[in-house]
Regions:
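Short, structured motif recognition centered on aromatic/hydrophobic residues
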Residues: 53-55, 71, 115-117
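Acetyl-CoA-dependent GNAT
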Residues: 57-61, 119-122
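A contiguous binding-surface segment within folded domains or other stable secondary-structure elements
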Residues: 60, 64-73, 93
Length: 139
């Protein structure tokens, strides 16, 4: 058995692509438009031949999707948690759970999907402004 992807329904495709590609740094692997089914599938990953997330955009969706408590979050390992969070914050992304411990942070996608960011290797030394930054909202 081989893990392939996780599917996320998105309400605003352009906002979702801006977030996942321009802000989070994923790349588009492939795309499929179905005129008959009236949907678009876009597969994103950290690199070629890596597991993907599938963004599903239903063309006729009128209301934003809601998420239940059965789905938790996506998680990505990053080379430098502080640099990643700073870049995201500079691009308008709210850091819901700052990396106070130098290891873990949480953000949310435009469709309210929680995303965990984990420092590669050992935690970095606690550093300001992150060490004293409060949580914002939930994650």
């Amino acid at each position: 058995m081989k893990y392939l992807h996780t599917m996320i329904r998105v309400f605003d495709l352009e906002k979702a692509l801006d977030f996942f590609i321009n802000k989070l740094g994923l790349i588009e692997i492939r795309r499929k438009d179905s005129e008959k089914g009236r949907f678009t599938l876009i597969f994103l990953a950290t690199a070629e031949n890596e597991p993907t997330i599938e963004l599903t955009y239903n063309w006729d969706q009128k209301e934003p999707y809601t998420t239940g408590r059965s789905f938790g979050h996506l998680a990505y390992q990053v080379d430098n948690i502080y640099d990643t969070c700073k870049k995201l914050q500079e691009n308008g992304v709210i850091i819901n759970r700052p990396p106070r411990d130098g290891y873990m942070a949480f953000i949310k996608s435009p469709d309210n999907i929680s995303i965990e960011l984990l420092q590669k290797g050992e935690p970095l030394a606690p550093s300001e402004p992150w060490a004293s930054m409060p949580n914002t909202g939930d994650w």
